[in-house]
Amino acid sequence: MKDTKLPFKEYTVMSNNLIQNLNCSDVYRAYTLLLTADKDSLETNTTLKQLAGFVGEELDNYKKSKGTLSFNDKLRATGEVVIRDIDSKQKDRHWTMYRFNQVEPGNYRRIGREFYDTYNTLDLKLRGFILKLFSVTEPHSHVIKLSPIRKLEKRIHMGHDTCLLYTSPSPRD
């Protein structure tokens, strides 16, 4: 996708609260949405159809279904994003404006577009899990000092088996 002109900034900032309170797939979706947001106001009017295209999945994954909230509802539930529907006063013409809260010093991660360019072929959940791990690293490093694994699970809101699945060496290694 490097050859494709995408409306992305070179990097974005994400609140650790946003990262840690969404599931893995939604973390990556939010990261991609933030890449399209204005760097000062953190606002974007990217459509869910556009976002699905950037992430490489179907639009249906963003809609409410039996037993799951829509992507927008999940974002709202974090308290980190204000979502407004804007009506253009024309028939069948409206759009959604997303405004992410400004990040708090020491409680965010700066994530480059390089992450998108390099890892966009990995499984969506794995991309989100990498971002979740990144959110618990020491500032300006990639060192995770949380131990035992139970503390990590609690911090990133993930189950024990999932953490072990992604952090333990493969039997094939």
Predicted regions and their residues:
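Short amphipathic alpha-helical interaction segments
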Residues: 60-74, 159-165
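Alpha-helix C-caps/helix-loop-beta hinges
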Residues: 78-79, 168
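Conserved small/polar residues in nucleotide/adenosyl-binding loops
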Residues: 166-173
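Short recognition helix of helix-turn-helix/winged-helix DNA-binding domains
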Residues: 1-57, 80, 84-151
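C-terminal terminal-subdomain/extension
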Residues: 152-153, 159
